[in-house]
Amino acid sequence: MRPVSSAEEVGALLSRSDSSGRRRRSSPVQSASPRPAGCGCGGPRRQSSFRDDVGHAASETYLVTRLTFSLLQYLGLGYRWMSQLLALTIYAILLMPGFLQVGYYYFFSSQVRRSIVYGEQPRNRLDLYIPKDINRPCPVVAFVTGGAWIIGYKAWGSLLGRRLAERGIIVACIDYRNFPQGTIGDMVSDASQGISYVCNNIASYGGDPNRIYLVGQSAGAHIAACALIEQAVKESSGQSISWSVTQIKAYFGLSGGYNMHSLVDHFHERGLNRSIFFSIMEGEESLSRYSPEIVVKQSSSQTIALLPPIVLMHGTEDYSIPSSARFLLMPSADVHLR
């Protein structure tokens, strides 16, 4: 089986889900996301001077450097870690020509709205990829990138954003705090807040608020699934919410893992030490809490009924997260595996 995470197949699945999907019932929500000033299909442009951009870049560079040294304290300088770092460096060098093309598009294209603020934390930013010509409200993808919970960044979704924007789909790439800046609870909270911003504000950028699809890849698939299920639990129990699960037309999980207990040994063998993984997941005792497969089995029928159709895709030759980890068993839920 070949991987099915290409922009073409995601776009096709979105169209299929849109044409055959059931009507979602709406739910009143209490908006907690700031709404952008202005309106119009093109959406408000982020007003910033060159000085502001330089200052923002400098602060992010300092933050990344500081967190890198903090991370090295966790990782140590073992042979396995160093060998994998060397392999990753060589891999990045070989892909540099492609990176340069994507980087040029990311920084200079008028279709990209970079670093839109959705919350108060330093990494609470998202990028929007807008189609050139918007004649009517566009379908929307809220994308949570992967990165082993450590190196995720919103720009990793730039190629997906570009390809889907060419097909008339608005893409919102949501950034979130990585470890050691934050743990899994912070990541899920950030992702949920980013989704809230998309649900409450995307119409101002030409998006259709009734056609929002949540997509996560690798660690991002795990984080997005946690955010979705956590929101369903809150909504079914009558808690105050800033966005409704019923606003999500479908969830697509690409190469994700949904039972953290089953992945501890695998990650350890791949170089992610158990102690580091437990620190990311807020302790071994929290693995069940952040395992979507376990949470849904313990959830009420009211919670399950709120969840949108779910499509899980995984390549059988994926060694980062084994394809067996894709099984997210949900009684009475609309789940498709590919």
From Swiss-Prot:
Q: Which of this chain's residues are annotated to bind substrate?
A: G146, G147, A148, Q217, S218, A219
Q: Which UniProt keywords apply?
A: Endoplasmic reticulum, Golgi apparatus, Hydrolase, Membrane, Transmembrane, Transmembrane helix
* Gene3D superfamilies per the UniProt record, alphabetical: alpha/beta hydrolase (3.40.50.1820)
| Record's keyword annotation contains DNA-binding | no
GO-annotated cellular components: endoplasmic reticulum membrane; Golgi membrane
What coarse category fits the chief subcellular location reported for this protein?
endoplasmic reticulum
Its placement in the membrane is given as:
Multi-pass membrane protein
Q: Where is this region: Disordered?
A: 1-46
**What Enzyme Commission number(s) appear in the record?**
3.1.1.n2
Cell location: Endoplasmic reticulum membrane; Golgi apparatus membrane
The record's active-site residues are S218, D318
The portions of this protein that span the membrane are 85-105, 140-160
Q: What does this protein do?
A: Catalyzes the demethylation of isoprenylcysteine methylesters.
Q: Which family does it belong to?
A: Belongs to the AB hydrolase superfamily. Isoprenylcysteine methylesterase family.
> What's the name of the protein?
Probable isoprenylcysteine alpha-carbonyl methylesterase ICMEL2
Query: Quick one: which gene encodes this?
Result: IMCEL2
